[in-house]
């Protein structure tokens, strides 16, 4: 139910195949969208003829010589002859954990990309900065530039990246950038919301410190 999964499902649907999209979280594109936006996307996906199951996940694949069914965590079994796995980015923190470095969703780093050990740096998809793990190329390159400068003795700070994503396969354009909208519930951000249900429009702008 993330970007890759939705794009793959839409591509397969063009061949008139029966598609079931299984998402482990409680909504589609949970890393980018709030509940309201995800519900609108859910409707668009179903209108394309795709079945959607949320808050569940694959437990096992069954079949002889080829897959015949998928067993889900909920106990359901889905008949299948093709399975596409689009799990996205999951940082491997095993080495950092064994080394005693602080970890969260990824290896925690400060503004200089240093880990809990100041002589060890982490960048890219394994690093967690200010609670965020970036799964895109551009933030990884920005982190690399900062880490290289610090290692070379040049003062530099990483202040986070604008993590923008756009879904291009649905009739309704979906775009998200910046902080996750759920963070407004913590009080760190305020939000301005525009809704036009008749036309399927929903916009949410997060703001902090008056901007």
Put a short name on every predicted segment.
Residues 1, 24, 125:
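Cofactor-binding loop segments of dinucleotide-utilizing enzymes, especially the Rossmann-like FAD-
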Residues 2-5, 148:
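Catalytic nucleophile loop
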Residues 5, 28, 61, 93, ...:
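Flexible, glycine-rich phosphate/dinucleotide-binding loops
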Residues 5-60, 140, 158-173:
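Rossmann-like dinucleotide-binding cores of NAD(P)H-dependent redox enzymes
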Residues 22, 71, 109, 206-209:
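Hydrophobic alpha-helical segments, especially N-terminal targeting/anchoring helices
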Residues 60, 112, 204:
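Short, surface-exposed charged micro-motifs
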Residues 63-71, 76-149:
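FAD-site-proximal beta/loop scaffold in flavoenzymes
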Residues 126-211:
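Mid-to-C-terminal Rossmann-like scaffold of FAD/NAD(P)H-dependent oxidoreductases
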